[in-house]
Curated annotation (Swiss-Prot):
Record text on subunit structure and interactions: Homodimer.
Family membership: Belongs to the CFA/CMAS family.
N-terminal signal peptide: none
Binding residues annotated for S-adenosyl-L-methionine, in chain numbering: 98, 136, 160, 164, 186-187, 202
InterPro entries named among the record's database cross-references: SAM-dependent_MTases_sf
Sorted UniProt keywords: Cytoplasm, Methyltransferase, S-adenosyl-L-methionine, Transferase
A Gene Ontology biological process term: methylation
Protein name: Probable (S)-tetrahydroprotoberberine N-methyltransferase 2
Amino acid sequence: MGSIEEVKKESAEETLGRLLRGEINDEELKKLIKYQLEKRLQWGYKSSHQEQLSFNLDFINSLKKMGMSGQVEAFTNEVYELPTECFEAAYGKSMKLSGCYFKHESSTIDEAEEASHELYCERAQIKDGQTVLDIGCGQGGLVLYVAQKYKNCHVTGLTNSKEQVNYILKQAEKLGLRNVDVILADVTQYESDKTYDRILVIGVVEHMKNMQLFIKKLSTWMAEDSLLFVDHSCHKTFNHFFEALDEDDWYSGYIFPPGCATFLSADSLLYFQDDVSVVDHWVVNGMHFARTVDAWRKKLDKNMEAVKEILLPGLGGNHEAVNGVITHIRTCCVGGYVQFSLNDGDEWMNAQLLFKKK
């Protein structure tokens, strides 16, 4: 790694204070975030390959001693339980809450959402007539896409958000879909004897800790010839928790509450094959994620006043609280762009893996 471009020295509290008061423009914000991310890269990259392997293996072994999931409740309440109208005003048409796939330079966010869903179906080898389970289904974009494309598939979404369950079921009814179910449950606590032909896990691994326990649980829902498709954000080389590196790291703890987010390396899930075997493995360049969050930011800025009005009732009419939520969403978008566009998208990216049951 080269030298890090220095920024104005101030405490994490001072930086956050200026951010929340609206005193940091996007240009400065990008520089401040890049500084923290470059420190992360210097921390994560080791001087020899053996040292890198040992560093990663120590991290992987530490996960096996933890509980299944991180402390995601605060993040869920802050992000996923926002009013659906807020997502409609800031995200794409299907309100996909993870990275999209931009086939062309001219692709819109709506087109990138659909291309992403198409890619998932292709790589998961979904065929008409199968039973499909989407873990952490969000607003149901993928559930509804699969249900419409494969009329004889029965598609089940699983989410711990009541708001999301209600939205998906209403959309399925509007579309006349009778092949959609949604389960309201925490995946780490949910138990069922039912099995599925395909299991999709998009943007969930990032909120897990003990991957061994998580994949073991998923394997119990896999039919004999089932396939498990996983997509997760990652760094290409090293693993890390998205937590503050030092007392000056204002960014990591602001984006995710402590214990909430895990970024594996692109190949770390290959160390968790007790109950499954890898069939295929891909990476998606980080620029796709960067373009996704940049599109979200632009749409949010365009609809800013409407979003404020949507958020205000749920926050007790507190304008300061509304501004706080919007600042957090915008900072996530700006930060995601900086992070996933570093080195032309070849640092942080998305890994996609296909597993079969052992």
